[in-house]
Amino acid sequence: ERGGQRLDLTPPAAIVVPAVSTVTAPAPAPPEQPLGKFQMTFYFIIHEAEMDGPRPAGANGGAANDNAEVSLASVGAPLTVAAPAPDLVPLNDQACVPLAHVTRAFAAQVSMQGTGKLRDGRLVNVATRCQCGRPCFHIVPSHREWGTGGSGRSLVPFRSVAVDPAVVKMGSLLYIPALDGQRMPGPRGVGGFVHDGCVVAVDTGGGIDGHQLDLFVGRRAYYKALARRGGSHSWSKRVEVWSGSGRCEQKGGKLRRTAAAI
């Protein structure tokens, strides 16, 4: 007791502090790295009918893989054999068996572009292995509407690029500021959208060397539509290319800019 009053020496009740839950912050996106200045060129599916016009007379109505007939009846042989029109050359498969006979000009273009559509509707891609003395081709499955790249992945207009694998790793997401904000030509579902600059490296090519990339644009008409005044593509001759790993993403088979980068 103190001063006639009893002192309460009971210790105060402990103060309970509620536990604080720890929230783990998402890992920061990897920093974007500049890859340097690149020359950007373009490639597309070359259409036999658009390039060659009507098939030369004598080529059996213009079917891509039909041949002119040569009759041997005049020399006593009751036999009719097929022979290609003199200005046509074969597009061989990997077994060196002709898939079609086409003009030399179309053969040269489809070898350079990598993908072509024949008059009969078949889509052909350059094959990676060939022992025929000239480029070989294979028929592209119908569900791959735009062909395939060197990686085996489907090409997508305005999103797929061909690169030199010694400079850019296959499968890399890239960001090209020169494309960002440009409206792409073509109907909705193919083009008709404002580009966000995101592309992916899925293809290669014999003509792609060093700091060069080739943007797949689908059709020749879309390539022409990307030209500036006077039909010039000079705007693409020297463009900045960045790693897109922190800005671009692929979800559900679609390539787009990440929400954080919008």
Task: Describe each model-derived feature in a short phrase.
Residues 2-262:
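Solvent-exposed, well-ordered loop and adjacent helix/strand elements within mature globular domains
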